[in-house]
């Protein structure tokens, strides 16, 4: 199963992950979240995401350095994101190609892929991604 969700605030991210986990409790939950909005990329606000991905079996966060630059914001360190989400299992990407390649390399047997963003994960084409993952 693949789900695309507009969740981007901490409460919505947590609620979406929990709802998917409740409905697909026997499946591996791969939760991908894009830090995309001005507030989500703010180093003071990012701590609000604490434990939001804790029910995901494989939690992933993506952010774009180009988005940070266009919003005239300071770079975020991977370790700061891991610490803010309070999840040492968190996988962080800032390169959409590497993120996509990682997803394609995964085994999706008995899995749910959850893509949460108000953006598009660095211009990833969801239809192409779905075709690649289902082959």
For each predicted feature, which ranges?
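ATP-dependent carboxylate-amine ligase
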Residues: 1-135
């Amino acid at each position: 199963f693949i789900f695309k969700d507009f969740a981007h605030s901490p409460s919505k991210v947590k609620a979406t992950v929990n709802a998917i986990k409740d409905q697909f409790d026997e499946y591996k939950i791969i939760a991908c979240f894009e830090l995309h909005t001005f507030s989500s990329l703010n180093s003071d606000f990012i701590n609000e995401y604490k434990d939001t991905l804790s029910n995901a079996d494989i939690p992933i966060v993506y952010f774009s350095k180009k988005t940070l630059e266009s919003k005239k914001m300071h770079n975020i360190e991977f370790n700061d994101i891991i610490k803010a989400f309070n999840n040492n299992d968190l996988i962080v990407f800032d390169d959409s190609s590497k993120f996509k390649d990682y997803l394609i390399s995964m085994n999706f047997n008995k899995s749910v892929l959850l893509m949460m963003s108000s953006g598009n994960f660095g211009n990833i084409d969801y239809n192409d991604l779905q075709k690649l993952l289902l082959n």
